[in-house]
A protein has these predicted regions:
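The feature captures the beta-strand-to-loop junction immediately N-terminal to the Walker
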Residues: 35-37
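ABC ATPase NBD Q-loop/coupling interface
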Residues: 59-78, 118
């Protein structure tokens, strides 16, 4: 079952097509990877899917009906879509714990609704932070974490969200091997929960390990798609 579709999707910058007439279907509950050389349009595509930038031509639709071209970009989160960025984005002046709680409570962490369900949310936050090894740092400000820890916290926030479609832009970049294992485990857990994950990644070993389906892009166009082992046997992708 397709959960996200693009049809003739196009985005131009200074007259050049960064994404060029792209039509894809993403299957629900699967891990789909987007691969290709630098400058091939991968991040631009993620930005379009997440509503970060305006579509020039074509449409993005969710479950075959909700067309992104007909709603405001800031509304995309209401349609069950969330994402991470190449540059980590957290609430820097909040604690590690509050960075999770603010997601669990949909930003109501400081009001009476949070107090009513405080123990439930704290237990859930502890579970998430223990998965990434940051429970002991729960009272530390996010800004004081190392880069790898900050990236783990950003990924962990995804676990706490109610989103159904998760867009991950190079989630393994700059991580030590032990952290890569943690993030891989989180991505697999998201799939087990029935979430749809769309992943940009350059490491082909990780692509083979995690992906159910692969899209190959270059110059904004779709060059190939299919199961990872079949696609990667036929192509050399940077």
């Amino acid at each position: 079952m397709s959960v996200l579709q693009t049809k003739n999707l196009t985005k131009r910058f200074d007259g050049i097509n960064a994404v060029n007439n792209l039509s894809i279907d993403v299957e629900k509950g699967k891990i789909t990877s987007i691969i290709g050389p630098n400058g091939s349009g991968k991040t631009t595509l993620i930005n379009l899917l997440s509503g970060m930038i305006k579509i020039d031509d074509g449409v993005v639709s969710f479950n075959g009906s909700k067309e992104l071209s007909k709603i405001q970009p800031y509304q995309v989160g209401f349609y069950g879509v969330t994402r991470t960025f190449q540059e980590v984005r957290l609430f820097e002046q909040m604690t590690v714990l509050d960075n999770i709680l603010v997601v669990l409570t949909e930003r109501n962490v400081f009001n009476s609704l949070f107090e009513k369900h405080k123990q439930y949310h704290l237990k859930k936050a502890q579970e998430v932070l223990e998965k990434i090894g940051l429970w002991e740092k729960r009272d530390q400000l996010a800004v004081n974490l190392s880069y790898g820890q900050r990236k783990l916290l950003e990924i962990a926030r995804i676990l706490a969200m109610k989103a159904e479609i998760i867009l991950l832009d190079e989630p393994f970049a700059g991580l030590f091997p032990e952290m890569v294992k943690i993030v891989s485990g989180i991505i697999k857990e998201l799939k087990q929960k029935g979430k749809t994950v769309i992943l940009i990644e350059h490491n082909m070993d990780l692509i083979r390990e995690l992906s159910d389906h692969v899209f190959v892009m270059d110059e904004g166009k779709l060059l190939a798609e299919g199961e990872p082992h079949k696609v990667l046997e036929k192509r050399e992708v940077v």
